[in-house]
Amino acid sequence: MLRVEFHCHTIYSKDSLLPVEKLLATCRRKGIDRVVITDHNKTEGAFRARELDPERVIVGEEIMTTKGELLVAFVKDRIPPGLPPLEVIAQLREQDAFISVSHPFDVMRKGHWELADLEEIVPLVDAIETFNARCFSDKHNQQAQDFAKEKGILGTAGSDAHAAFELGRASMVLPEFHDADTLRTALAQVEYRVSMSSPWVHFTSRYATMRKKIGIGIPAYISK
């Protein structure tokens, strides 16, 4: 069985200062066997991490569509933000990616989904995120869990970590998998190991965003 972190960010995200190397070291220390790196609208950090630890790292992306965010694993090519969700999903299907929906009911997040828009895409995606450790209220996770049960769709859980101490806060234990198809099969046997993060973690993201805007201590290879 594998312990999986399905939702995390690196310094390549606009609101994280977590170096790729530190993320990988923390995953090893915490016994995280697979990590899906889902930077905001970018894949450079995930590809760099996979070069360093190809067995542990799965390339992902958190993509902002015109309606809400999608959380994707086994990405081959970056999808830019700002496209309609149906267009993004079609492009991801061409890549044989696994598609989940980020924190769909967390109305405190910019990337949450209106119910009508979520209903439209549910038949076209593989899962929705039924537990996100950074949700401002656990009721948003409960709404996602109830919705997934009603629709008979798989659920993913993730820490949404933007800092090293958050990694593994919400993880999944799964049988071996190696691509989107085997991940779908494995999720039918998922065991969730989850706990909520303090709302204070969001200040780490705001601090990272501010640092990048003014360019303090940010490596030259990272765009603001």
Per-region residue spans from a language model:
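Acidic/Gly/His-enriched mid-domain segments of enzyme catalytic cores or analogous surface patches
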Residues: 102-106
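Charged catalytic cores and adjacent phosphate/nucleic-acid-binding surfaces used
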Residues: 1-25, 44-48, 52-59, 65-81, ...
